[in-house]
């Protein structure tokens, strides 16, 4: 298949926005794969701020970062992503160039603990305040469960209503696949 799958495309988008020395955000740590990916890009002079409400996600991400010798490039926060403005350093405004959200539940974790539309939208709004122009927020939306469908609808409504003078919004996904395949909403700050 020549078309890029959803998760590789999410990384392609992040690679176009995030450079060495930048700040990036992994708004849903999960098992730390995206955190490590971003930490490799930002290098020793940048920083990745990772958020998760689940202790096991913090632990898994810490282990993965240490195994790859990237732990010093990350700040892991055991709290909701909607607290990011209170966590980011004062010099973050204009230095955050990329952020990723994997909306849904922790792979292999408790499927009753899911991301919520209100905190997700609040975090997006906060990111748009501090992001550099042309910074990109990537939301990978898993909507194969009831809460995921509610969050999908809320995030799409929010994104569709963003002023085009503030941001460009892209939706990317395969529309003829079964079982509610994940799709991307990417928001590029203008």
Annotate each predicted stretch with a short phrase.
Residues 1-23, 27, 36, 40, 58-95:
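S-adenosyl-L-methionine
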Residues 19, 42-43, 131-133:
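Helix-to-beta-strand junctions that scaffold the AdoMet/dcAdoMet cofactor pocket
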Residues 28, 130-141:
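Conserved beta-strand signature within the Rossmann-like core of class I S-adenosyl-L-methionine
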Residues 47-52:
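Conserved SAM-binding motif I beta-strand of class I
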Residues 101-122:
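Mobile active-site "lid"/loop adjacent to the S-adenosyl-L-methionine
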Residues 119-133:
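A short glycine-rich, Lys/Arg-flanked "PGG" loop and its adjoining helix->strand segment in the class I
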Residues 148-190:
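Class I S-adenosyl-L-methionine
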